């Protein structure tokens, strides 16, 4: 499973990523995603290995992706770059800053964990709305050219339901 770590600047994403991946924290600001595989130690598997003595023991793994910080003031092109990285993960881990440090300023206008969460939620919902609206438009254009397949008709109905949820400020899942 690939888990993307997503959050505003200076929230501690890379610090948490380093701890989960078992690598030293270098403190650098990244513009590209960093990916590491973390082996999940399981004592039950160790016990079974002692009992059955297999040729090798394969532990479960998690793939962590440290997505660059999401800058609320960035232009659309930069935001899209981050959203494309998000599309390549199976799950999102939102990292919200809940510590105070005078040396590390809060992201502009997002000084409480609730404000940070709402800002990220809003950005994700807006992005999902753009994707859904674009797909609905493409389906409607195709409908004018040729008769839609039953699958395309179901997709358009489903996208309409998803669009309604997003417009109400809810995630689709």
Region locations from a protein language model:
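Conserved G1/Walker A P-loop phosphate-binding module
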Residues: 1-101, 108, 114
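Conserved C-terminal guanine-recognition region of P-loop GTPase G domains, centered on the G4
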Residues: 52-58, 71-173
